[in-house]
Amino acid sequence: MNPQPSGMTWNLLLLTWLVALISTLSALFIGEVMGQAPCVLCWFQRAFMFPLTVILAIACYRSDFTVWRYALPLTVIGAALAFVHTLLYAGLIPQPIQPCTATGPSCSGAGMTLFGVVPLPALALFAFIIIAILLIIIRRRTTP
């Protein structure tokens, strides 16, 4: 017998979707409105965040609390990419294995910060971690 999800669980699912939605809209704003071209790692992170927005929206609509089964793998992979990107930004990854080319956008330039303080790769990592935590909480609330 599965535990019945409460209204609080649905609110957590909605919050999870909102985090993904805000992340997606922010990435689109930075790229399309501000005109900042994403680097290679940003594209890969987008490939994992953008589908989460759609998947979690459908899960909210259907009250599908098993969404963690297919959203959590995307989140973990996206978080791993964001972690590598954050290490790259911090200068902890050696130069020879940096994925950005000399002709493409820089992963570690000054334009990769929010308000000149918070690195965008760290924000992406934070968003993926928050989504993962919320999905795990949803799983624990709905799985016996």
Curated annotation (Swiss-Prot):
Alphabetized UniProt keyword annotations: Cell inner membrane, Cell membrane, Chaperone, Disulfide bond, Electron transport, Membrane, Oxidoreductase, Plasmid, Redox-active center, Transmembrane, Transmembrane helix, Transport
Gene Ontology biological process terms, A to Z: protein folding
Entry annotated with the keyword Cell membrane: yes
One GO term describing the cellular component: plasma membrane
Principal localisation: membrane
S-S bonds: 39-42, 100-107
Transmembrane annotation, as ranges: 10-29, 44-63, 70-87, 116-138
Keyword Cell inner membrane: yes
Superkingdom as given in the UniProt entry: Bacteria
Pfam families (alphabetical): DsbB (PF02600)
Subcellular location: Cell inner membrane
InterPro entries: DiS_bond_form_DsbB/BdbC, Disulphide_bond_form_BdbC, DsbB-like_sf
Gene3D superfamilies, per the entry: DsbB-like
GO molecular function, one term: protein-disulfide reductase activity
Entry membrane topology: Multi-pass membrane protein
Function per UniProt: Required for disulfide bond formation in some proteins.
Family: Belongs to the DsbB family. BdbC subfamily.
Listed name of the protein: Probable disulfide formation protein
Native source organism of the sequence: Metapseudomonas resinovorans
